[in-house]
Amino acid sequence: MAGRDRDPLVVGRVVGDVLDPFVRTTNLRVSFGNRNVSNGCELKPSMVTHQPRVEVGGNEMRTFYTLVMVDPDAPSPSDPNLREYLHWLVTDIPGTTGASFGQEVMCYESPRPSMGIHRFVFVLFQQLGRQTVYAPGWRQNFNTRDFAELYNLGPPVAAVYFNCQREAGSGGRRMYP
């Protein structure tokens, strides 16, 4: 496959760290305010405090989707021992609508990276039908691949990620001369 090495999901190691290779078959649009998320773009923590608007493509409302948002770099990219950290989980999103029409299983938790540049990944799966998904007991050490297998979701149909790092002035120790 010729373009595989230029796929931003491969270059950004989302494919590998979070997902296996897949073919995008559905449109997924994520935006925070007026900023659309594109693969590898950088957003500041102050821009992502509120739940994003998520629009799902598809052909009809009788097809349902599951959206997962994870941080594979928690607590730090050099030692991601909490990989993956689950920030948001929404199921039963009807095709052609958005996440606000789905069932929120885990509420949105805004990214607050403390060290290094973190990737925040949105993954969309097509469901076989409406189904009951149980909230994981905790957010840390979530595994998108295992989750998809547990609920028989198959490969992802879309994914997008952004980078985010701590903003200057958002806490931490200050040194004064």
Curated annotation (Swiss-Prot):
Matching InterPro entries: PEBP (IPR008914), PEBP-like_sf (IPR036610), PEBP_euk (IPR035810), Phosphatidylethanolamine-bd_CS (IPR001858)
Listed GO biological process terms: inflorescence development; positive regulation of vernalization response; regulation of flower development; regulation of photoperiodism, flowering; regulation of timing of transition from vegetative to reproductive phase; vegetative to reproductive phase transition of meristem; vernalization response
Tissue localization of expression: Expressed in leaves but not in shoot apex.
Induction: Follows a circadian rhythm expression with a maximum transient peak four hours before dawn in long-day (LD) conditions, but barely expressed in short-day (SD) conditions. Targeted for mRNA cleavage by Pooideae-specific microRNAs miR5200a and miR5200b in leaves in short days, but not in long days. In cv. Bd21, accumulates progressively in the shoot apical meristem (SAM) before vernalization but stable levels during vernalization. In cv. Bd29-1 low expression before vernalization but expressed gradually during vernalization to reach a peak after 8 weeks.
Top-rank taxon, per record: Eukaryota
PROSITE patterns: PBP (PS01220)
Family: Belongs to the phosphatidylethanolamine-binding protein family.
General function of this protein: Involved in the regulation of vernalization and of flowering time; this process in essential for flowering in cv. Bd29-1 but seems do not occur in cv. Bd21.
Name of the protein in question: Protein VERNALIZATION 3
The organism of origin for this protein: Brachypodium distachyon (Purple false brome)
Lineage of producing organism: Eukaryota, Viridiplantae, Streptophyta, Embryophyta, Tracheophyta
